[in-house]
């Protein structure tokens, strides 16, 4: 599963809904294989920005480039082909399907022979089906999900469902992995377990990771750099230690409390 991360360049991005500006001329770059965290209070524009990157929203101005390729305006279903994978805040899984089946769906963009050949299991379609299942088993091993591989996702604990959501995004072998608050709703033990896997993904697989998170301690422990948004605008970016001490961050995101 080892791969190469892509360079993500966001420049002067603007997104509006009616008279409300959700993203205000935001610019930043995530270097190849960087673990870049994005933080900010609720309503800061973090999820809206992710929605622009993977094609759910189309911004009114600015550019988004992945290894120099402009991704704005491309059909949503082509984002996986470009190398963009995403785990949503709410896992967005198929609850009646097993873990294996959800991960196979996550690899849909990797199938080359077409639905007809794959569906009747012969020739090139059969070979691709075998390869897809082999790749899925590797992901199951990586995330230590073998006990749950044949369990319907809806029957799993919430923390395991969140892990399956990240695993399904990784099943695309993305160059850019978007994580939207993967720790939301998790207890401390589950958060620590997810942090362990984020480090493994970064170190052992190597996609570029853009990670929206509220847990500043986890961000400080894991992220290479941090971008801070407030009211749709970027107020600062830098390494975690500098971000924790930045007056603008303390005032806008954390109140007057020390971090």
Where is each model-derived feature located?
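Conserved ABC transporter NBD signature motif
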Residues: 62-69, 82
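Helix-to-loop junction immediately C-terminal to a conserved catalytic motif
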Residues: 54
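Catalytic Walker B motif of ABC-type/P-loop ATPase nucleotide-binding domains
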Residues: 177-181
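Conserved catalytic motifs of ABC-family nucleotide-binding domains
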Residues: 173
């Amino acid at each position: 599963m080892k791969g190469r991360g892509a360079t993500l360049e966001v420049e002067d991005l603007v997104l509006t809904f009616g008279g409300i500006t959700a993203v205000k001329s935001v610019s930043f770059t995530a270097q190849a294989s960087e673990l870049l965290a994005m933080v900010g209070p609720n309503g800061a524009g973090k999820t809206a920005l992710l929605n622009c990157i993977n094609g759910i929203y189309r911004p009114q101005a600015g550019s988004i480039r992945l290894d120099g390729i402009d991704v704005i305006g491309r059909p949503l279903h082509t984002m996986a082909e470009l190398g963009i994978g995403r785990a949503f805040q709410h896992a967005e899984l198929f609850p009646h399907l097993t873990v294996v089946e959800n991960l196979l769906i996550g690899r849909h963009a990797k199938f080359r022979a077409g639905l007809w050949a794959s569906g009747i299991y012969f020739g090139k379609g059969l070979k691709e089906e075998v390869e897809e299942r082999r790749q899925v088993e590797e992901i199951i091993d990586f995330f230590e999900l073998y006990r749950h591989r044949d369990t319907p996702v809806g029957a799993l604990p919430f923390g395991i469902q969140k892990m399956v959501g990240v695993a399904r995004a990784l099943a695309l072998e993305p160059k850019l992995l978007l994580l939207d608050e993967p720790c939301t709703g998790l207890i401390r033990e589950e958060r620590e377990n997810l942090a362990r896997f984020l480090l493994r993904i970064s170190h052992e697989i190597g996609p570029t990771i853009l990670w929206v998170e509220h847990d500043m301690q986890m961000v400080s422990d894991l992220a290479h750099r941090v971008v801070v948004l407030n009211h749709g605008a970027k107020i600062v970016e830098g390494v975690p230690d500098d971000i924790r001490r930045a007056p603008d961050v303390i005032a806008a995101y954390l109140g007057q409390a020390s971090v």
